[in-house]
Amino acid sequence: MKSTLRISLKAGERIFINGAVLRVDRKVALEFLNDVTFLLENHVLQPEGATTPLRQLYFIAQMILINPEGKDHSTAMFRKSITMLLTCFKNEEILAELKRIDALVSTGRAFDALKAIRGLYAIEDNILNNHELPPTMVEQIRREIAPWR
């Protein structure tokens, strides 16, 4: 980290820091003075929210961040998932971004990968609503890359 990072949390808000979950009891500002892996509560996707292929990929990438002891397993799941998604999607924008997301995770930048995945949700929703990705394929992806269910 080149400089300090300051974030503000509201009372009752949670933050995931290096695998630990913290809840603050009052409004507080945190200042990170060195490198840290964190995820704000409003960016955490619960398993039941991982209902589309990209949301499933997001869930797996977030596990790399918030579960350090399971990082190797989550990274292996991510590799399997990204490979599958690269063969299923036909949209050039999604394909290019998936390759960039893969590179981000490969270089230890899972947080940036999460942001990039969220940026693809609208395109994915459009693809799914127009049945450009057949529902049977979506279901196959769901079964293949959703072992937490």
From Swiss-Prot:
Q: Which domain of life is it from?
A: Bacteria
* GO MF, one annotated term: mRNA 5'-UTR binding
Q: Name one GO biological process term.
A: mRNA catabolic process
* InterPro entries per the UniProt record, alphabetical: Flagellum_FlbT
Query: Is Nuclease included in the keywords of this UniProt record?
Result: no
Question: Record's Pfam families?
Answer: FlbT (PF07378)
Q: Which UniProt keywords apply?
A: Bacterial flagellum biogenesis, Repressor, RNA-binding
Provide the coiled-coil residue spans: none
Q: What does this protein do?
A: Has a post-transcriptional repressor function in flagellum biogenesis. Associates with the 5'-UTR of fljK mRNA and promotes its degradation.
The UniProt similarity line reads: Belongs to the FlbT family.
What is the protein named? Answer: Probable flagellum biosynthesis repressor protein FlbT
